[in-house]
From Swiss-Prot:
UniProt-recorded name of the protein: Insulin-induced gene 1 protein
Site positions for Required for the recognition of 25-hydroxycholesterol: 145
TM helices/strands, residue ranges: 59-81, 101-118, 134-156, 160-178, 184-205, 220-237
GO MF term set: oxysterol binding
Location (main, coarse): endoplasmic reticulum
This protein's domain notes: The KxHxx motif mediates association with the coatomer complex.
Function of the protein: Oxysterol-binding protein that mediates feedback control of cholesterol synthesis by controlling both endoplasmic reticulum to Golgi transport of scap and degradation of hmgcr. Acts as a negative regulator of cholesterol biosynthesis by mediating the retention of the SCAP-SREBP complex in the endoplasmic reticulum, thereby blocking the processing of sterol regulatory element-binding proteins (SREBPs). Binds oxysterol, including 25-hydroxycholesterol, regulating interaction with scap and retention of the SCAP-SREBP complex in the endoplasmic reticulum.
Record PANTHER family: INSULIN-INDUCED GENE 1, INSULIN-INDUCED GENE 1 PROTEIN
Keyword Lipid metabolism on entry: yes
Length: 251
């Protein structure tokens, strides 16, 4: 009998210990689930905030690039008109195109697209920047671009071929000085080809025209202007992207 009582007591003790272990394990599992839920909620909220911040920065950068493109278009087109490089036909003056309001808008939109594409290509290609980016370098790039456009309107060469070769060398020098990236060269070249094609179509349809065209309907140096403009806008877009990234990290 004593042995039976001892056996029953040991069984009851072991059962109570197992029950306590199971309850402890259940409590740990419950608390772990609560902690995982809290962590998931915090991470989801952080991701949502980061995504919203990135979207806001993208819109802000696009607006800045659009404004820059509009301002550059107004200034550079004024230089061309003063030298009678570009003209508007008389029949167009009676239409909505007479004020050429669409030129700055188109240039602003193109600047926003190109400026946003440059940092995206850098990120996807994994191509590091050759230089330490700063706004002083970007401003010098803008000054050189305006100088190239001014030279296209002011300089007088014996023929347009010499002018085109000179501007091509200056445009490549601008890319080499302020960029030197394959993505920058490729996107600048693509911008030059597409913009020149669009200009050809506009002139062909009588909306726009150039005096003394020597490259189908436009001037032969026009692709050089578009190339240097694409590189310039790309540098602005990269600088804006770097500033936005640093701000996000600080936040």
């Amino acid at each position: 009998m004593p042995r039976l009582e001892e056996h029953c007591w040991s069984c009851s003790c072991s059962t109570s210990v197992k029950t306590k272990d199971l309850s402890s394990a259940g409590w740990i599992v419950c608390k772990t689930g609560e902690m995982m839920s809290i962590i998931t909620s915090v991470l989801s909220h952080a991701y949502g905030s980061l995504h919203s911040l990135q979207s806001a920065n993208l819109i802000r950068r696009g607006l800045v690039l659009f404004i820059v493109g509009v301002v550059l278009a107004l200034v550079l087109n004024l230089l061309q008109i003063q030298r009678n490089v570009t003209l508007f036909p008389e029949e167009v003056l009676d239409t909505l195109f007479s004020s050429a309001w669409w030129i700055p808008l188109c240039c602003g939109t193109a600047a926003a697209v190109v400026g946003l594409l440059y940092p995206c290509l850098d990120h996807h290609l994994g191509e590091p920047h050759k230089f330490k980016r700063e706004w002083a370098s970007v401003m010098r790039c803008i000054a050189v671009f305006v100088g190239i456009n001014h030279a296209s309107a002011k300089l007088d060469f014996a023929n347009n071929v010499q002018l085109s070769l000179t501007l091509a060398a200056l445009s490549l020098g601008l890319w080499w000085t302020f960029d030197r990236s394959r993505s920058g060269f490729g996107l600048g070249l693509t911008t030059a080809l597409l913009a020149t094609l669009i200009a050809q179509l506009l002139v062909y349809n009588g909306i726009y025209q150039y005096t003394s065209p020597d490259f189908l309907y436009v001037r032969s140096w026009l692709p050089c202007i578009f190339f240097s403009g694409g590189v310039t806008v790309g540098n602005i877009g990269r600088q804006l992207a770097m500033g936005s990234t640093e701000k996000i990290h600080n936040d």
